[in-house]
């Protein structure tokens, strides 16, 4: 059985999220007379990861920790010149006191963002870049705030790519585990298929400030790429969150709370138009006002 851990300072974390939520994401005054081309859907490809199977380490339940799970959604809606315009939202879930403790769920957004276009980058690449920025910004805001107790866990959807040595040093000093869990990642199928039943992990690389692993969080759970600054944090995760089909429930809740509705997407386009942008096609007024029974994110 895991040991009891101090509870998260929920009001302090809530104030951080609320402050992040109120930050100005886009100076809409600069849109006047800008001609925006409204975008259609397009699926992107995840980053490639090669699994080098090594020794498989079994996981047992560890320390009961307070955890924060962060996920986001971003939808490209328009472009002009060399800029993408996206609407995004983030979900933040706090769980303290063990796997079955009631979660606190917060939502950031929806907000508009302007992202400079990189050479060869498509709209889904821009959306991934924005999601990484939003989730990473919230993660680092919480990490550097001092609002966390020892042995806290911060979970984000996706990898920990871009994490600096300074951030890792702060996490180690605060005894906080940063954990990135990728739902979709290109791996060698035969290698992932041969991953033993969990819970456990095999290290792919451990030469930076965080380890990259191929892991199962329950016996027959879906194999995942999991990045972590502290491998012991994976044991704490098993004691601190419900694992559903091999995936942490708190991250699942964060994902659902970040999903953007079609009416929110249409409202974002309306906001662009209200600030002087010339759209390439007229908006559907009924959908903008009422929405339809469909979600994206």
Question: How does the language model describe each region?
Answer:
Residues 65-75:
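Two-metal-ion RNase H-like nuclease active-site motif
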Residues 74-113:
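Acidic, metal-ligating active-site segments
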């Amino acid at each position: 059985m895991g040991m009891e851990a101090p509870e998260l300072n929920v009001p302090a974390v809530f104030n951080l999220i609320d402050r992040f939520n109120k930050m100005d994401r886009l100076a809409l005054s600069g849109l006047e007379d800008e001609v925006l081309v409204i975008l259609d859907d397009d699926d992107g490809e995840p980053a490639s990861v090669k699994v080098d199977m090594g020794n498989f380490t079994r996981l047992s339940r560890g320390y009961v920790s307070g955890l924060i799970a962060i996920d986001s959604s971003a939808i490209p809606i328009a472009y002009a010149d060399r800029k993408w315009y996206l609407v995004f939202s983030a979900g933040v879930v706090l769980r303290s006191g063990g796997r079955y403790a009631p979660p606190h769920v917060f939502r950031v957004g929806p907000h508009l963002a302007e992202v400079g276009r990189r050479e060869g980058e498509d709209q889904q690449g821009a959306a991934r870049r924005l999601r990484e920025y939003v989730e990473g910004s919230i993660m680092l805001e919480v990490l550097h705030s001092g609002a966390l107790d020892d042995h806290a866990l911060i979970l984000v959807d996706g990898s920990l790519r871009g994490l600096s040595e300074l951030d890792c040093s702060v996490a180690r000093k605060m005894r906080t585990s940063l954990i990135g869990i990728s739902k979709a990642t290109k791996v060698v199928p035969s290698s992932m298929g041969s991953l033993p039943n969990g819970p456990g992990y095999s290290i792919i690389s451990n030469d930076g400030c965080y380890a990259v692993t191929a892991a199962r969080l329950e016996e027959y759970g879906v194999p995942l790429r999991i990045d972590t600054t502290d491998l012991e944090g994976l044991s704490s995760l098993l004691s601190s969150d419900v694992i559903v089909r091999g995936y942490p429930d708190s991250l699942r809740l964060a994902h659902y709370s970040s999903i953007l509705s079609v009416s929110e997407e249409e409202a974002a386009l309306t906001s662009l138009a209200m600030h002087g942008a010339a759209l390439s096609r007229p908006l559907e007024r009924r959908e903008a006002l009422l929405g339809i029974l469909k979600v994206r994110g």
